[in-house]
A protein has these predicted regions:
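Rossmann-fold dinucleotide-binding core
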Residues: 3-95, 99
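Exposed alpha-helical structural elements
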Residues: 19, 23, 71-74, 96, ...
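A generic short alpha-helical patch detector that favors 3-5-residue windows
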Residues: 33, 67, 101-105, 129, ...
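Active-site-proximal catalytic alpha-helix in oxidoreductases
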Residues: 54, 93-121, 125-138, 164
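Short, structured loop/turn "capping" segments at alpha-beta junctions
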Residues: 85-89, 111-119, 147-149
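NAD(P)-dependent Rossmann-like dehydrogenase/reductase catalytic/cofactor-binding core
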Residues: 119, 127-232
């Protein structure tokens, strides 16, 4: 969905960072897939136990950007009847990019700094870093025919509003699980190369978080900030 571009010559492109061998695209025809963006923020607090933080939106849509189909409308109705918001969108790819816009930025920054969303957004240096990464990602998306429906400032404000939420990447790093780096950041780096778009800030953060992931894998370790004992 992210890499199927309307740009000439790139419609058949496949992002190797998320489908290295091509087995997903070969095994599951695109026509069998319905796009959905999961907006609720949550936290894995125990095996099999997920704590819901906020959010109830699950936008859905056909991948080819066609008008709503019967199957999409049925899925939307099921979500709605269960108490969720599931609007049917004509351009689900743009909505996926909107979600990715924040994920590729806040996830690695939080993983490297061990900070929550509100901490990142309210600290001037990391807020500007996030904005720089988002500007670069937006340039990549524009070359792929994607237009964002919200401004950069509004997207950052939305992340700040979530509050003291620990991102999924930071949760993985603290728990010693392999962080989801390539799907969230590496894909955009790959698409930037495909579209000849410079992304210096994204590249730098990607290199750092990849090195962290490599160290965790080699040491079978986790990285967590621990409070120090204060002498009486």
């Amino acid at each position: 969905m992210l890499f199927r571009s309307s740009t000439a010559g790139r419609s058949k492109a496949r992002a190797s960072t998320v489908d290295p061998t091509g087995i997903v695209s070969q095994s599951i025809p695109a026509r069998r897939v319905i796009g959905c963006v999961v907006y609720p923020a949550s936290e894995l607090i125990a095996p099999g136990v997920v704590k819901h933080i906020e959010g109830d939106r699950f936008p859905v849509g056909e991948l080819d950007g066609s008008s709503s189909s019967e199957r999409v409308n049925r899925i939307s109705a099921c979500f709605t009847n269960a108490g969720f918001k599931a609007p049917v969108l004509d351009d689900i790819r743009a909505e996926i990019w909107l979600k990715l816009w924040g994920n590729l930025t806040f996830n690695p920054i939080s993983g490297l700094s061990h900070s929550t969303l509100v901490d990142i957004c309210q600290f001037p240096l990391t807020r500007e870093l996030a904005a720089s990464m988002m500007r670069e990602a937006q340039a990549v998306a524009h070359k792929l025919g994607i237009e964002f429906r919200v401004t950069l400032d509004k997207r950052i404000a939305g992340a700040e509003k979530v509050g003291k939420h620990t991102t999924s990447m930071l949760q993985d790093i603290e728990a010693g699980r392999a962080p989801e780096i390539d799907a969230l950041v590496g894909t955009v780096v790959e698409l930037a190369r495909l579209t000849d778009t410079p992304t210096p800030h994204i590249d730098t953060v990607y290199a750092l978080v990849k090195l962290l992931g490599k160290g965790m894998d080699e040491q079978h370790g986790q990285v967590r900030l621990q409070p120090m004992a204060v002498a009486a």
